[in-house]
Amino acid sequence: MSLKERKSINECDLKGKKVLIRVDFNVPLDDGNITNDYRIRSALPAVQKVLTEGGSCVLMSHLGRPKGVSMAEGKELGSAGGIPGFEQKATLKPVAKALSELLSRPVTFAPDCLNAADVVSKMSPGDVVLLENVRFYKEEGSKKSTEEREAMAKILSSYGDVYISDAFGTAHRDSATMTGIPKILGNGAAGYLMEKEISYFAKVLGNPPRPLVAIVGGAKVSDKIQLLDNMLQRIDYLLIGGAMAYTFLKAQGYSIGISMCEESKLEFARSLLKKAEDRKVQIILPIDHVCHTEFKAVDSPLITEDQNIPEGHMALDIGPKTIEKYVQTIGKCKSAIWNGPMGVFEMVPYSKGTFAIAKAMGRGTHEHGLMSIIGGGDSASAAELSGEAKRMSHVSTGGGASLELLEGKTLPGVTVLDDKE
């Protein structure tokens, strides 16, 4: 898809307005305590912009995957004094407290997102209200009919005048809060986080500084078929790691021991290698591996001499020669996009490949102006763990959304926003 720039929060008249902001506060919780507040902090610039301009904020988010209830069931529960769809592990109440501390001002928590008209009507400029988890209602979901989503969006739309989307992580969802509200209000703009995501993906998918390398890893070829197919039209180099590399190696006739392999995808691997050759895209596969006989961490795993993996062994990371080759390739490029780890990085003996990629991208960005983009999910976690995330050009907050963009799909939560004026 070609990503067009969208109307920015900077172009909106916010003074005296009640501004509905769809944020992504889907933070990790441990017994009600937030273990990583990165997503909350990422939303602060948009919230502060509204408050500085003399508006008030009504914030909407999901957290986790609660079961949820229908609006009809919610009405009954609400009239009986209950909180519709409530699940302790998915409540946004701890987020309201954390947000209040970060903003240094009170944040009012509305315990039922569809029964908050009273709370919202009492708001003055400078006030912030956080609605309870929108997924406590099933109508938020993209699997519901348009009419059902619309019914929920109508109620939420009545709380505000202006709609801002700052939740790139759910931009691939056609849901009540992502697409329903802007359609009803007739306006929709991107917050700063959404704007940054669109800007970087537009660059890498449009006209990036060249050469451009894609580093693709993860377990299954089947999860990345569309991504590989789409990116092959845009890149100069493709580095493949993770368990998916062994399907490609087997397709080339190498022995892969007991490493993971998708037999049904061998033909696809061969055709992709041929397509790359025709398009003069250089696909680089691992030339050595870090192996063991079982899927567990050991002090001295076997490092192979070449591409072949011995019988009875499984590869769990790329080897030192491969690391050197991949790092050299990244060093030759002016743009890099990374999606998926090189090995089982959660286990220390098999983390070197993934962390070496993170380091090469961080150093390239910091020292040579490389445009580096991390496509969310496991790659973002690995970049954080390696300490290199802060040196990258952009670490995406949306695993699923960034994957769909790289596959060439359009994102409903982006296309619904107004075009830049």
Swiss-Prot record:
Q: Is the Metal-binding keyword given for this protein?
A: yes
Disulphide bond pairs: none
Domain of life where this protein originates: Eukaryota
Q: Give compartment(s).
A: Cytoplasm
Q: What is its main location?
A: cytoplasm
One Gene Ontology molecular-function label? ATP binding
Catalytic EC class: transferase
In its UniProt entry, what is this protein called?
Phosphoglycerate kinase, cytosolic
